[in-house]
């Protein structure tokens, strides 16, 4: 805006004779005053990089004197970006339509509050005129000109200038049949203005989506899908850089790939946010349920008081698994007992857990005692599935049989002792008789 206003102020005095009032009745020849003729006032480039040299070589316009050669050094302002290429390639050679520079000048005067006949700029039913002009210009963008964007714009501008120089003489010298496209517009200011507005609408429809320029989303909201019948010019932002049709297709392909990544990242960010929110809500909820059991593999060596100290008993795999599970449950109960809070409910739970642990320990010791007793009884020593009742009965019978054997052996011992006494007394009698 500042550059355009400064340019307009600089051109008011030199171009007073060529000034053109913006009116619907103005002939189309006044719009031949191209912005390219005053481009050196705004953008200083070397001769090989000046893409506007073609317009200066035509010689159809006379460049007015510059207000100051070092204007940018005086005000320490950056030069404006290069002019965007026009989208009206088919009508580029026609001199009855205003150029892109005139479009920018018209928009500048309109936005600056100048007295302009708005009925010529846009019809009441066409509201996308100003937006289409703003979209086509790089200087309305809100982002800094990156290296890639400058390269693309420069290449497209050079191609457009070359095609414009070659297409003009070729079209004028070729006496071929009339084109099969739409008929040429009728002469006159009203007809030229109508075709000009129609061409601007088509150019706005070819504009690319702003997401191509901004591959990363500017906000966390997902872009809304456009309705099928929506106007493309109304859906586009004002900071979209211009591009040709082929470049638009390439940018759309890149846009599809970038959108997939962006949506994936957005989905991941939303899923991570939801998971973190659920985790925080779970942490904030009070825990009314009992503590979760934690598997702790701790080896606890228990002494079997019923078994002999020197006897090593080896149990089957199933029984060893049962014993290990009992020990693990005991350790878990001890851990839960230590970690539970000291409240009335927790104390009752601790007592109950302690009782359960002691009961399990008693049962385990009793089971070990039965196993040891079974190993001492010959009849059920090899029977691993012998019930406790059978073990007790066989143990009782075995004890009784042992006791009967003991009594029998004691009686035999007594008889032998008596026999010995008798034999000893008889031996003494024989010794006394010889003497």
UniProtKB/Swiss-Prot annotation:
PROSITE patterns: BHLH. Gene3D superfamilies: Helix-loop-helix DNA-binding domain (4.10.280.10). It is found in: Nucleus. Residues 163-193, 222-286, 335-359 are annotated as: Disordered. Keywords: Activator, DNA-binding, Glycoprotein, Nucleus, Phosphoprotein, Proto-oncogene, Transcription, Transcription regulation. Residues 350-402 form the bHLH domain. GO terms for molecular function: core promoter sequence-specific DNA binding; DNA-binding transcription activator activity, RNA polymerase II-specific; DNA-binding transcription factor activity, RNA polymerase II-specific; DNA-binding transcription factor binding; DNA-binding transcription repressor activity, RNA polymerase II-specific; E-box binding; identical protein binding; protein dimerization activity. InterPro entries: bHLH_dom, HLH_DNA-bd_sf, Myc-LZ, Myc_transcription_factors, Tscrpt_reg_Myc, Tscrpt_reg_Myc_N. Residues 409-430 are annotated as: Leucine-zipper. Residues 247-259 have a biased composition (Acidic residues). Glycans are attached at residue 80. Residues 175-188 have a biased composition (Pro residues). SUPFAM superfamilies: HLH, helix-loop-helix DNA-binding domain. Residues 231-246, 264-278 have a biased composition (Low complexity). A motif (9aaTAD) lies at residues 105-113. Disulfide bonds: none annotated. One of its GO terms (cellular component) is Myc-Max complex. One of its GO terms (biological process) is negative regulation of monocyte differentiation. Efficient DNA binding requires dimerization with another bHLH protein. Binds DNA as a heterodimer with MAX. PANTHER family: MYC PROTO-ONCOGENE. Alternative translation initiation from an upstream, in-frame non-ATG (ATT) codon or a downstream ATG start site results in the production of 2 isoforms with distinct N-termini, shown in this entry as isoform 2 and isoform 1, respectively. Transcription factor that binds DNA in a non-specific manner, yet also specifically recognizes the core sequence 5'-CAC[GA]TG-3'. Activates the transcription of growth-related genes. This is Myc proto-oncogene protein. The gene is MYC.
């Amino acid at each position: 805006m500042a550059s355009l206003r400064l340019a307009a102020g600089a051109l008011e005095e030199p171009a007073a004779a060529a000034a053109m009032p913006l009116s619907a009745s103005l002939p189309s020849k006044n719009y031949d005053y191209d912005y390219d003729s005053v481009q050196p006032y705004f953008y200083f480039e070397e001769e090989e990089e000046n893409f506007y040299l073609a317009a200066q070589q035509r010689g159809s316009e006379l460049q007015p004197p510059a207000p100051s050669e070092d204007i940018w050094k005086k005000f320490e302002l950056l030069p404006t970006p290069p002019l965007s290429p026009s989208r009206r390639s088919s009508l580029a050679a026609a001199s009855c339509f205003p150029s892109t520079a005139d479009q920018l000048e018209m928009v500048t005067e309109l936005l600056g509050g100048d007295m302009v006949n708005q009925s010529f700029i846009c019809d009441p039913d066409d509201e996308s005129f100003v937006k289409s002009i703003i979209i086509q210009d790089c200087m309305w963008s809100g982002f800094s000109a990156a290296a890639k964007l400058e390269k693309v714009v420069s290449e497209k501008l050079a191609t457009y200038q070359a095609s414009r120089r070659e297409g003009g003489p070729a079209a004028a010298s070729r006496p071929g049949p009339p084109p099969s496209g739409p008929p040429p517009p009728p002469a006159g200011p009203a007809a030229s203005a109508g075709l000009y507005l129609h061409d601007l609408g088509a150019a706005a429809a070819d504009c690319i989506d702003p997401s191509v320029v901004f591959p990363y989303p500017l906000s966390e909201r997902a872009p809304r899908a456009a309705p099928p019948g929506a106007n493309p010019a109304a859906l586009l932002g004002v900071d979209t850089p211009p591009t040709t049709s082929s470049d638009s297709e390439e940018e759309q392909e890149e846009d599809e790939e970038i959108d997939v990544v962006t949506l994936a990242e957005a989905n991941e960010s939303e899923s991570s946010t939801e998971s973190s929110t659920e985790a925080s809500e779970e942490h904030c909820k009070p825990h009314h349920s009992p503590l979760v059991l934690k598997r702790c593999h701790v080896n606890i060596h228990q002494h079997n008081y019923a078994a002999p100290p020197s006897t090593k008993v080896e149990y089957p795999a199933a029984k060893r698994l049962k014993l290990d599970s009992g020990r693990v449950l005991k350790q878990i109960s001890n851990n839960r007992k230590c970690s539970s809070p000291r409240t009335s409910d927790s104390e009752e739970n601790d007592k109950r857990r302690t009782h359960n642990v002691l009961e399990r320990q008693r049962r385990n010791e009793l089971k070990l005692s039965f196993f040891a007793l079974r190993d001492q009884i010959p009849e059920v020593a090899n029977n691993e599935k012998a019930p406790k009742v059978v073990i007790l009965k066989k143990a009782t019978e075995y004890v009784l049989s042992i006791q009967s054997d003991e009594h029998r052996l004691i009686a035999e011992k007594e008889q032998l002792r008596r026999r010995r006494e008798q034999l000893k007394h008889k031996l003494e009698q024989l010794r006394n008789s010889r003497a």
